[in-house]
Amino acid sequence: MVEIPVSRRALPRPTAWWVVVAIPLAVALFDPAALGGVLDFAARALGGTLPYILAAVLMIAGLKATGAERAIGAAFEGRESRAIVLAALMGGLAPFCSCEVIPFIAGLLAVGVPLGPVMAFWLASPLIDPPSLAITAGALGWDFAIGKAVSAVALGLFGGFAMKALSGLFTDPLRPRQSGGCGCGAPKMGQPVWRFWEHADRRAVFGQELRVNGLFLLKWLTLAYLLEALMVRYVPAGAIAGLVGGDGVFTVALSAVLGMPAYLNSYAAPALVDGLMAEGMSASAAMAFMIGGAVSSIPAMAAVWSLVRPQVFAVYLGLGFTGATLAGLVFGMIV
C-alpha cells in the first residue's frame, strides 16, 4: 500500500478573515431574520471607528518613514511615572470605547512608548469621558458618575504602575507580524527626516506601513464589531441580573467577570445598569459590572489578542478584572 504524502500547504491556516465571513453565514443559516440587524450594527460601529483607524495608521506610517519613532520612545525615558499619571488623566477625557482605543494603542506600542503609560491610557480611556459622565449622572445619579470617573483614573494609575513594575518581563510586547514584503527595508534612521516623501526608500516604508497596519486593524476590528453585534443580540441582560444581586466579594468579582461578555459602551451602559439595579443588582456589583464590561469586553479582547503577546494579554485581563472588582468593593463601602 502506497501512502500519498499530504502537503501542509493543501490546508491553509484559518485566519480572522475566515471568521469575519463565517459569522454572517452562520447567522444567515440559523437566524436569517437577524442578519440585517447584525450586519448593520457591525457596519455602523466600524464606520464610526474608521476615522480613528485612518489617523492611527497615518501616524504609524509617518513616524516610521520619518524616523521620529525613536525620538518619541526616548521622550519617555526617565519620565515614565509622570507619563503614567498624564495618560490616566487623559484617558478620562478621551471619548473612546474599548475597541476604538485599539488603533491608538497599536500606534503607541509601534513607536516604542513604554507599556506603563500605554496601559494607563488603555484601561482608563474606555471608562469615562465628559459626555458619558453626564449620561451616567442622568441615569444613575452623580454619586455613581463621580465614582466611575474616579475609578477610571485610579484603574489607569493602578494598571500603569503595575505594568511599569513588570516591564522587565515584556521587552517586546507586540506580536510579530508579517511586513509588507516589498524588500526595501526600513531606511537607516538618524535624525528624523520630516520631508520623507523626497526620499524613495522612505516613501516605500510609508506605503508599506500604511498598507500592513491598515489591513491589520481593519481585519481585527471588523471581527471585533461582528462579535459585539452577536453579544448585543443574543446575550440577554436579564439573564445576568439574577446572578449578581448581593454585596459580597464573590458577587462583586462575579459581576466583573460577567461584565466582560455583556459589551457595555459608555453611552448605552447607564440605562442597562439602571435596569439591572431595578432587578436587584447592588451598587457595588453594578460598578464592577460596568467597569469590567467597558474595559474587557469580548470584542476588545479579540482585538487585543491580535495585537500583543499572550503574556501582555493575560496581564491586561488580570488588571481589568482586579481593578473592576476593587472599584466595586470600594464604591460599595462608600455609598
Language-model-derived ranges and their functions:
Residues 1-17, 168-209:
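Intrinsically disordered, low-complexity non-transmembrane regions of multi-pass membrane transporters
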Residues 2-4, 83, 137, 141, ...:
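Juxtamembrane and boundary regions of transmembrane helices in multi-pass small-molecule transporters
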Residues 11-27, 49-58, 176-177, 181-193, ...:
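Hydrophobic mid-bilayer segments of alpha-helices in multi-pass membrane transport proteins
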Residues 18-28, 56-62, 153-164, 224-230, ...:
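Hydrophobic core segments of alpha-helical transmembrane domains in multi-pass membrane transport
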Residues 22-60, 124-151:
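Long, highly hydrophobic alpha-helical transmembrane signal-anchor segments
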Residues 31-106, 200-262, 270:
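Membrane-embedded alpha-helical segments and adjacent helix-loop junctions characteristic
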Residues 51, 55, 98-102, 132-133, ...:
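Alpha-helical transmembrane segments and their lipid-water interface positions
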Residues 83, 91-149, 232-312:
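Membrane-interfacial helix-loop connectors
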